[in-house]
Amino acid sequence: EHIVVIPASGGKIRVESVNKQYGHPEYRGIFEIDLVDKALHIINELPLEEYLYSVVPSEMPTEYQKEALKAQAVCARSYAIKQMAGKRLAALGAHVDDSVSFQVYNNLREDAASIAAVNETKGQVVFAENQVAETYFYSVSAGVSAGIKEVWFAKKDRSYLMPCVLLGDSRKTLDLQKEADFSEFLQGEIKSYDTNSPWYRWRTTVSEKQLQQFISEKIKSRYEKNPTQIQTKQKDGTFFSTGQTELGEIKKVE
């Protein structure tokens, strides 16, 4: 059975069985509800601009400066349009989900600042290489960025998604091949765009057993998805996908 929930004019739909960071979430637009595998499958259908009202505060604190919020709105709009065209969730009747698998939606309540940022950039997108750009974004940079091939395993580079140094000086490259240089990069007073973020540099401690278990689980998961990405070094120096997913003792890091 297919159910459509349409709120009264100007109203929102509140889902009391779900908890977000701000409590029970409220949604603009309409709900389409289906029973799938004995669970409710809910799609929230609403205009793109109204969707962005609740994406911007979920991805960036609305206490930030207005121009930063507007930039986030443009990136979020561009990303959403690109995902709509990609049709990754077409089988489910949706364009995106509300998690970090796409971009976070309605984890924090929309407010005047997020609405203004969206309204004042209405219809604006990032355009590159004769199409809407793939505006991937992240919360904190360690001082460098990676390219689209390294992060998303893209088949070809994007001129606007190349690895680059994001430091507050004139350096365009970094040589971190030596352990001492890498240690200085992590522990020294390195100024960058995100220097003031609490996650710019951080420290944690795990046991050897925990680390081995964690890495083994990730290797197994990645192997199950794409065996060619997990290869074992042979005695002759070549690499081959053997199905070995258990992590042995680490002897050397290159």
Ranges and model annotations:
Residues 1-254:
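Conserved, single-site charged/polar hotspot
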